[in-house]
Design a protein with these regions (language model features):
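Formylglycine-dependent sulfatase
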Residues: 1-201
């Protein structure tokens, strides 16, 4: 049973956009973004436009289906979070027009290493201006790397927040905001130098 199935059974249109990371593909077999997830393993969503795994926010490829129609693999034309949000917003507008209830998931990989957001967001934070946690050891290379990574990480978070705002504005404009539940969560954080460690917590 997947989350899509009870919603579909209750009459909701279900959609998934973004990182899947459930098909068990290993990078040693090639770049995971080019692994095609077979339709039976796409969670039973009515619309599924995603990829198995990917760590290149400016080189993201999607494939999947909309209804019965298969969607061939294609490259997103801009930064992953912005492009995936564009897809979600288009979907919300379609659902608002047909009046049917819907359940949609947006699974954006950022914030994730490499910590590079669009320039307008990267420019908001400089490594020199980043405050480190008290548990980051006084080791020059650790502190330099932590500051550099956090500057990009913060830019990615602000970009994601801006995209959530775009979703909320679209829901309001379509009269759906008061009847829509938005659930936001993350699968992990990063250490950014805490106890001298980096990457996933």
């Amino acid at each position: 049973l997947t989350v899509a199935q009870p919603f579909r059974a209750a009459g909701y249109h279900t959609a998934y956009f973004g990182k899947w990371h459930l098909d068990g593909y290993q990078e040693r077999d090639g770049r995971a973004v080019f692994h095609r997830v077979p339709r039976p393993r796409r969670g039973g969503f009515d619309t599924w436009l995603g990829y198995e795994n990917n760590n290149a926010q400016y080189d993201t490829w999607l494939h999947g289906h909309t209804g019965e129609e298969e969607v061939e693999q294609h490259r997103l034309e801009r930064y992953e979070t912005d492009a995936l949000t564009d897809l979600l917003l288009g979907h919300v507008k379609e659902r608002a027009a047909d009046g049917a209830p819907f359940f949609a998931v947006l699974s954006a990989q950022p914030p994730h290493n490499p910590y590079v957001a669009p320039a307008e967001w990267m420019g908001r934070h400089t490594p020199e201006g980043v405050q480190l946690r008290p548990n980051v050891p006084a080791v020059d290379w650790v502190r330099e790397r932590a500051r550099r990574e956090l500057a990009g990480y913060y830019g990615m978070i602000e970009n994601l927040d801006w995209n959530v705002g775009r979703l909320m504005e679209t829901l309001r404009a379509r009269g759906l905001y008061d009847q829509t539940h938005i659930i936001f969560f993350s699968d992990h954080g990063d250490m950014h130098g805490s106890q001298g460690q980096f990457l996933k917590t």
